[in-house]
């Protein structure tokens, strides 16, 4: 029974990887289960043996994004004690993830979720809120609290900048690198943290 469970897990993973690959294509056409099944050379019924719905497939992608990003951020905040370095690291992680996972970027900005189950967009919004909360937490621990600096406002500003970079990347057909000129960008963004 363990071998069958392993094969099922592998098939689920293959379906999710194929869906992510299809999302990397610049076409803005809605991905149907028929197109996904055709790409995998299986029947639609075979897809539904592994996922109850297409929404569940997207949930699988969102779970991967969430686990990856929050895991990387947890590791980073454990390794770096300086809150400014933590903020810089988090922003870099968010941009690098998009660069390496182009199809996932379309999920992160909600583009791939248009006309899908509304709970998927809600789930992505919750992830954005969690990422912003991570930034806010780092900003709260800055030395001296940086009088006059509002961690909530700064975290929102940084997150809006990241989401803007994700949008530019996706809307350019993945031509405009979200992490382009990162050092120069951080030099400017980091000024917001100076007293």
What are the language-model segments listed below?
Residues 67-70, 74, 118-143, 152-156, ...:
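Amphipathic alpha-helical packing segments from all-alpha helical-bundle domains
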Residues 5, 12-13, 33, 55, ...:
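Short, structured helix-loop boundary elements
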Residues 1-26, 30-39, 56-59, 68:
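Basic, helix-initiating cap at the start of DNA-binding domains
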Residues 96-100, 137, 155-176, 188-195:
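Amphipathic C-terminal alpha-helical segment
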Residues 98-119, 171:
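Amphipathic alpha-helical segments used for helix-helix packing
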Residues 41-51:
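Short hydrophobic/aromatic patch on the recognition helix
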Residues 60, 74-100, 146-158:
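Hydrophobic alpha-helical connector segments
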Residues 11, 54, 61, 65, ...:
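Hydrophobic/aromatic residues within well-ordered alpha-helical segments
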């Amino acid at each position: 029974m363990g071998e069958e469970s392993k094969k099922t897990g592998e098939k689920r993973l293959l379906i999710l990887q194929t869906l992510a690959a299809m999302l990397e294509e610049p076409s803005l056409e809605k991905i149907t289960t028929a197109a996904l099944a055709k790409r995998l050379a299986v029947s639609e019924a075979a897809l539904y043996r592994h996922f109850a719905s297409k929404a569940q497939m997207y949930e699988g992608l969102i779970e991967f994004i969430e686990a990856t990003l929050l895991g990387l951020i947890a590791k980073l905040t454990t390794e770096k004690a300086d809150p400014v370095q933590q903020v810089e690291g988090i922003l870099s992680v968010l941009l690098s993830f998009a660069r390496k996972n182009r199809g996932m970027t379309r999920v992160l900005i909600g583009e791939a979720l248009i006309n899908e189950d509304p709970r998927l967009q809600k789930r992505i919004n919750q992830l954005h809120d969690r990422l912003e909360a991570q930034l806010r937490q780092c900003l709260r621990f800055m030395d001296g609290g940086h009088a006059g600096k509002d961690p909530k406002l700064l975290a929102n500003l940084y997150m809006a900048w990241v989401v803007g970079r994700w949008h530019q990347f996706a809307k350019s057909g993945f031509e405009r690198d979200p992490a382009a000129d990162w050092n120069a960008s951080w030099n400017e963004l980091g000024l917001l943290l100076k007293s």
